[in-house]
Amino acid sequence: MIKAKPQDKYLGDILNEGGLTQSVKETINDRYGKAFNTINEIGAVINDFRINAIGGLKSGLDIFEMVVVPSILNNSDTWVQMDNGSINRLEELQNFMFKNLLAVPHSVPTPALRSELGCLSMEERINCRKLSFIYHVKSLGNSALANEIYELQRNFNLPGLVQECRKLISKYELPNIIDENVAMSRIQWKKIVKKTVGEHSGKLLLAKFEQYSKLRDGPLMEDGLSLKPYLKNLKLCEARTMFRIRTLMMPAKFNMKNDPRFASNLWKCDSCQRIDSQSHILWCPFFAPLREGKDVQNDKDLVEYFKKVFDIREKMEKEKIESCMNGSS
């Protein structure tokens, strides 16, 4: 008796008897564990000898782009009928990488991650790959089997890659290379796809920023989707601090409004009794000597200033605790 296999691997993808959607899901599941372990290894490498190297964070991002993304998205230009579960799993993996790089908690506003690192979402990466692949198939000669299938899907609007790419072309308002005779080289097509999808992604991020009070009132609203210069120009530890400053995640009391320890005192600064917001730290009179000779508009000076401020605060808090313990004894 011949037993039927529920799934098998072909050219790196899992083919499942449940259909295209299930095949994509099983393919992602098959690669997820390896990608997850690789991300942890990348984190260990950059936290070891690149922690004090300028551009260390950018190096970690480059490794992710050159190693993890190609492996997890191999053949993704042919993944059709993907469901939201598969897309969300890929987004979670990318967000895990970004959080690992920036050493931030899971509570970080996720739109800020892509905005600062200048990366597309995993779904948008796949969309770009599909749009590039459909150009390639369209350009093949009539004798190619792939072109024959392409023509069948195009002429009869059959479910498949052509139908999905029609929707993507409409979504991103791209030239209709499927149904119209558009004179455009492969390089021109890739450039316009990359530019248009990037602009569309930036607009979506701005809409998501509105859902976070920390982001809609911060500098990220104006800077758009791009790799920020400080990620290349600062040491890894400094770049991580700068990310927290820009996303209002520094441990100022007003950044932790729900903490009962600070709410009971109306989030006042222990040094000047003003509301201890992150912007207040920039002009707090108690820390004025630390600002002498520094330009708080300069990324490096700003990071050094914040580091010294919170070092002093941590020391003062320890002394306060020790004093209370000595008094009670």
Q: What is each residue range found by the language model?
A:
Residues 8-152:
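Non-catalytic, peripheral interaction segments enriched in hydrophobic/basic residues
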Residues 7-8, 281:
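Beta-sheet entry/capping signal
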Residues 1-6:
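Short, conserved micro-motifs composed of acidic
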Residues 86-89, 93-246:
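Acidic catalytic cores of enzymes that act on phosphate-bearing nucleotides/polynucleotides
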Residues 45, 49, 207-329:
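Family-specific functional microsites
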Residues 31, 51-54, 75, 195-208, ...:
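Short, amphipathic alpha-helical segments
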